[in-house]
Curated annotation (Swiss-Prot):
Function: Component of the ribosome, a large ribonucleoprotein complex responsible for the synthesis of proteins in the cell. The small ribosomal subunit (SSU) binds messenger RNAs (mRNAs) and translates the encoded message by selecting cognate aminoacyl-transfer RNA (tRNA) molecules. The large subunit (LSU) contains the ribosomal catalytic site termed the peptidyl transferase center (PTC), which catalyzes the formation of peptide bonds, thereby polymerizing the amino acids delivered by tRNAs into a polypeptide chain.
Source taxonomy: Eukaryota, Fungi, Dikarya, Ascomycota, Saccharomycotina
Signal peptide: none
Taxonomic superkingdom: Eukaryota
Location of region: Disordered: 1-20, 88-119
GO cellular component, one term: cytosolic small ribosomal subunit
Miscellaneous information on this protein: Present with 503000 molecules/cell in log phase SD medium.
Similarity annotation: Belongs to the eukaryotic ribosomal protein eS26 family.
InterPro entries on file: Ribosomal_eS26, Ribosomal_eS26_CS, Ribosomal_eS26_sf
GO MF terms held by the record: mRNA binding; structural constituent of ribosome
PROSITE patterns: RIBOSOMAL_S26E
Name this polypeptide is given: Small ribosomal subunit protein eS26B
Keywords from the UniProt entry: Cytoplasm, Ribonucleoprotein, Ribosomal protein
Amino acid sequence: MPKKRASNGRNKKGRGHVKPVRCVNCSKSIPKDKAIKRMAIRNIVEAAAVRDLSEASVYPEYALPKTYNKLHYCVSCAIHARIVRVRSREDRKNRAPPQRPRFNRDNKVSPAAAAKKAL
């Protein structure tokens, strides 16, 4: 039977066992190397309150702290939430990260980004 992926969908080379992690979405237990991992970096303070805090602050240039969360998704939840997409057999060999769409102020894709995507 042919192999679908060279990595078997994992990042485990030469290790017998890998500790499991829990999916953020459905709590399914999956091996850590198989999980789809994303970093969620957000401001602790919401955007509406940033100005109020900066005006009330004693320090002139105080940098507000951020939360750093590492999110682990199982394959089915990552596909369902469109974190990763199903790709064709040829496209699966492409290891480069996909181009991120650039948005302008009106939340529309910029013409330069749309032109690149069309090529």
